[in-house]
């Protein structure tokens, strides 16, 4: 059964205007993204609007690593990487290398996590007894069940990082929202040259801040040049140049330290 309404030019005009306004505000809402700008309404203190766990989670990351339990039984990090095609992506809030084919995996407690991407934060997100370093890379892996395993490496200013050196020109010339083909990238070029690492359970450090992440933070501090960090910062959207989330409460979580030649205990 069809019902017909009587219309006139004024009614049609009002209807069209309402459609246009509705469409406009829908697009604005969809495009609203989180930022790192304090007081902007979209900064870290307001991320709860993008994911409830960002505001009320109890296992959030990053953290300040202080007291740890030495756990030699954790074993060395099991990496099984291989070269694969990758692209450089500028999201506006970070620069990432995304592998578009199988680039290998890491294995933790018998679970395989496939390598997805790596990205950078400056300054570092994790701190160590209150010390914050100049840069941190997150190498992100995901299991078949959707859980994450992220390997973090922190850097201080010094000699250039070889992996960033290879990407330097592309980083300098990539705009926000763009991606660039990188060809074949070997994940081992990141150089995971530390057997000692910290391990704890936490979250993604950006919305939705999901609390399904096994964190592995390498203990060794590497070096990066000031111009490399400058390139990473200048490529991002205005206000996001410093893209480190403040440290979160540990809420009594256990932080383990793997040292190959040390007995167990707390430090």
What are these regions (language model features)?
Residues 2-267:
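Alpha-carbonic anhydrase
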